[in-house]
Structure formats: structure tokens, C-alpha cells
Amino acid sequence: MASKVLPQALLVIPSNHSLQCPPLKKQLGFPIDSNRRFSLSSNCRSNLMVSRASSNLFSSNFSSIFSFPARNSFVVRSEAEDSSDAPAESVAVVAEEELPVESEAEAEERPPRQQRVKLGDIMGILNKKAVHAAEELRPVPGIRTGDIVQIRLEVPENKRRLSVYKGIVISRQNAGIHTTIRIRRIIAGVGVEIVFPLYSPNIKEIKVVSHRKVRKARLYYLRDKLPRLSTFK
């Protein structure tokens, strides 16, 4: 380590041949004769020559150590860049050509996405199917509030005999297959109300006797009115 640092320190000394060592009179404090001065000057020149030679050797060694790998690295980089230019372009072109083909293939292979069916939608579908099947067995007329209807009902407890009920429809509750109507009539001066499932299999026939126009959807106010308003011919 000291051998490498010493030439760097010696490089600071100027390389002028006419330069002589500084007088040592001031440094030493006593006079020096010419022979000694000449010998000192020759010694200084020899030291300068040695320092110059050592500096040249150090610079040559330094350049040989550090410049050779730099040149090699530069050459390697240039070759890598030159060699990677053409394949990069070809790879980019191939990728651009393959992308549309893959996207089209994926679009063709993917099946259409099915929408999620909620529980309410399922119940609605089942109600529609049940209503359609019941109407095929027995057609149901359009019944509105205020109509006078006649219903022929089969009673299982009465040896399946048919009973006829007639009255005014005071309300209708729509609930799919569970739709019901409420009929009111006067029996022995007393108001009687009966609820019938509209799509019940026990109902064999429903007949609309007459239509009446009313303003309200539910005629519950007839309960507080006179019995003659709930009678019909």
C-alpha cells in the first residue's frame, strides 16, 4: 500500500530540469560548501528522475489495470445492445400479431354469463306456472270489487255435493295462486261474509252475474250501512 501511495506523493514535485533543491542554509542554520551543494543537487535530480520513472510505471500499471476491463465492458454492452435490437423488434411484432387472435379465441370460448335468479323471482315464476295450470283446468273470469258473483263449491265434508253461494265482492287480495275474494250477503237479516280461494280445486264454477262500478277497492263500509245496500236480485 505504501509503494502505491509514494509515487502519488512524488508526482507533486515539478519536473523542471533546471530546478535545484532549495538552499539548506536557512533550514539547517549553517553554511554548506559548493561540493556538498552539488552533491545535493545531483541527489535531488536523481530523486526527480526516480519519481518520474515511478510515476510513469504507476500510471502505466494503473491504466493497464483499470482501462482494460472498461474497454471490454463497453464492447460487451455494445454487442448486447446490437444483438438485442433485432430480436426485440421481432418479438414485439409477434406479440402484436398474437394478441388479437388470443382475444378472439377467448371471446368465442367464453359462454354467456347467466343472470342470478333471486328467491322472489323464483316464487313469482312458480306462481305464474301454477296459475296457468289452474286456468287451463277451469277458466277464471275477470272479477272486480262490486261485482255480483255466483260460485258453485264442492264440499268434501258433505259427500262432495255442490253448494251455491251468491253475493257481492267487497274485496280482492291478489297473491298469485293464493288469490282470494271476499263475498258478502244478507241471510235472515244478518250480514255474512265468506272468503273463497279463487284458484281452489273445490270451486267448480264461478259466474259473474252483474258488474257494478264502485269508487273504492274495498267495500268494508257496507258493514255499517243498512242491509238493503248489500242485497241484490
UniProtKB/Swiss-Prot annotation:
Highest taxon of source: Eukaryota
Q: Under which name does UniProt file this protein? A: Large ribosomal subunit protein bL19c
GO MF terms here are: rRNA binding; structural constituent of ribosome
Per the record, the gene is: RPL19
Q: Which Gene3D superfamilies match?
A: 2.30.30.790
- Major site of localization recorded for this protein: plastid
Q: Which GO terms describe its cellular component?
A: chloroplast; ribonucleoprotein complex; ribosome
Q: Name one GO biological process term.
A: translation
Where does it live in the cell?
Answer: Plastid, Chloroplast
Protein family: Belongs to the bacterial ribosomal protein bL19 family.
Keywords annotated in UniProt: Chloroplast, Plastid, Ribonucleoprotein, Ribosomal protein, RNA-binding, rRNA-binding, Transit peptide
User: What is known about its subunit structure?
Assistant: Component of the chloroplast large ribosomal subunit (LSU). Mature 70S chloroplast ribosomes of higher plants consist of a small (30S) and a large (50S) subunit. The 30S small subunit contains 1 molecule of ribosomal RNA (16S rRNA) and 24 different proteins. The 50S large subunit contains 3 rRNA molecules (23S, 5S and 4.5S rRNA) and 33 different proteins.
InterPro entries listed in its UniProt record: Ribosomal_bL19, Ribosomal_bL19_sf, Translation_prot_SH3-like_sf
